[in-house]
């Protein structure tokens, strides 16, 4: 069965180009041209991935992303004409998985679509190299097979990408990982984003798992190098 893609862009020529090229790749494509219709379309079609413009009439892309994340975990790639770190970072903090700045290469965007779909929907047994055992880190228990984490017995709601990042760090406890390395291994080798994506995802993780995110005891920064998961006896 073909993967479903929802394209949301108020510039119809751009949406048409994306629809044409994505259909050539074998995807089922549905388009919306404003924020309100986008939410309705996503709820109706329940796509496998969403390409979401930031600047939209009605609800903007940020509002749409926030609304969709209340119910769904499919990858969301933000499309922005504003070459602004604020927009990019805010989009990721709301739960977007990736972003592309206009003008963009259709070939690059399709590569990102494939990378996000592959990473999000690949089988857990493959992604964790057959690991089935629980991983305990102080008060946190990771359940690889269930793609879930608990802290002091309480479930921690993580996105797919957040889980992958935390689980990867847990398999390399105490080892400092550069942002570039994490982009390659967690986001995929053909990921075209910048290292700021890692920083934002780390910040989201800390807000969910740390007692005091400003003084983390699990995910530690090695300034100028990267991140590592602190060992606990």
Curated annotation (Swiss-Prot):
It is found in: Cytoplasm. Residues 132-231 bind DNA. The modification 4-aspartylphosphate is found at residue 53. One of its GO terms (molecular function) is transcription cis-regulatory region binding. Keywords: Activator, Cytoplasm, DNA-binding, Phosphoprotein, Transcription, Transcription regulation, Two-component regulatory system. Its main location: cytoplasm. SMART domains: REC (SM00448), Trans_reg_C (SM00862). It holds the Pfam family Response_reg. GO terms for biological process: regulation of DNA-templated transcription. Phosphorylated by WalK. Residues 4-117 form the Response regulatory domain. One of its GO terms (cellular component) is cytosol. Member of the two-component regulatory system WalK/WalR. This is Transcriptional regulatory protein WalR. The lineage of its organism: Bacteria, Bacillati, Bacillota, Bacilli, Bacillales. The gene is walR.
């Amino acid at each position: 069965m073909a993967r479903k893609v929802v394209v949301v862009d108020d510039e119809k020529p751009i949406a048409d180009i994306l629809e044409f090229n994505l259909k050539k790749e074998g995807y089922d494509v549905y388009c919306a041209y404003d924020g309100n219709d986008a939410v309705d379309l996503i709820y109706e079609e329940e796509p496998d991935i969403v390409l979401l413009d930031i600047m939209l009439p009605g609800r903007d892309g940020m509002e749409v992303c926030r609304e969709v994340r209340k119910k769904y975990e499919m990858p969301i790639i933000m499309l922005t004409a504003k070459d602004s770190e604020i927009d990019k970072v805010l989009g990721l903090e709301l739960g977007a998985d990736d972003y592309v700045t206009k003008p963009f290469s259709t070939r690059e965007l399709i590569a990102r679509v494939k990378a996000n779909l592959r990473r999000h929907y690949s089988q857990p047994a493959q992604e964790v190299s057959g690991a089935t055992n629980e991983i305990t880190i102080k008060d946190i228990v990771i359940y690889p097979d269930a793609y879930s984490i608990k802290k002091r017995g309480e479930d921690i709601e993580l996105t797919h990408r957040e889980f992958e990042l935390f689980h990867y760090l847990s398999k390399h406890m105490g080892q400092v990982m550069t942002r570039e390395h994490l982009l390659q291994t967690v986001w995929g080798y053909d990921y075209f984003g910048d290292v700021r994506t890692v920083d934002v995802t780390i910040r989201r993780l800390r807000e969910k798992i740390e007692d005091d995110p400003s003084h983390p005891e699990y995910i530690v920064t090695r300034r100028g190098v990267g991140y590592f998961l602190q060992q606990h006896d």
